[in-house]
Amino acid sequence: VVLMVGIDSVVGLLAGTVLALLYFVENFSKGHFDITRNRGNQFIDRLYEGDFEKFSDSVDVVVYSFKGSLTYVNGETHKDRIHEKINMFNTIILRMRELGHMDHDGLEILYEIIEELEHEKKQVYITGVTEDMKILMLKNDKSHLITEKMVLENTTSALREIGFII
C-alpha cells in the first residue's frame, strides 16, 4: 500500500509539472506587448494584447512595446505581429523599456525586424535600451543596422525627433 501511494503521488507530481511547463511555454511564446497609437502630434490610445484585433491604420506613429523577454521562443511571434499589423505605418518606435531579458536569438529577431522595416522604407527608432542590451547589440555582426540616430533614451525623445510637440 505504501509503495502504491508513493508511485501515484510521483506520477501526479510529474503530470502536474509537465502540464504547468506546457502552460508556461504556451503563455511565454505569445510574446507580450502593447501598442501606443499617435496621430497628428496627439496620443490616440493604447492597445493591449487582447485589443490587437481592433488595430487600424488611422495613425501616423506606432510605438510597439516589448514586454518581458525577447527570445527564440517568442521572437517569431513578435516578428509576425509586426509584419502583419505594424508594417503599414511609416514610423515605428520599438520600445524596449519593459524588456527584462533578451538573448542572442532575440537579438537576431530584432535585427530581422529592423531589416524588414528598413527594406520597406520605414523610419525605425529603438528606445529604452539598457546598457547590457547595448553591449549585446554592439557585439553582433549585424550591429551596422543600428545607427546612433535610431537608438534614443526614451519614447518621448523619439517622438520629439519625429516632430511631435511634447
Predicted regions and their residues:
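The feature marks cytosolic C-terminal regulatory regions of anion transporters and related permeases
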Residues: 1-144, 163-166
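Short acidic-hydrophobic, aromatic-tinged amphipathic segments that line or gate anion-handling sites
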Residues: 145-161
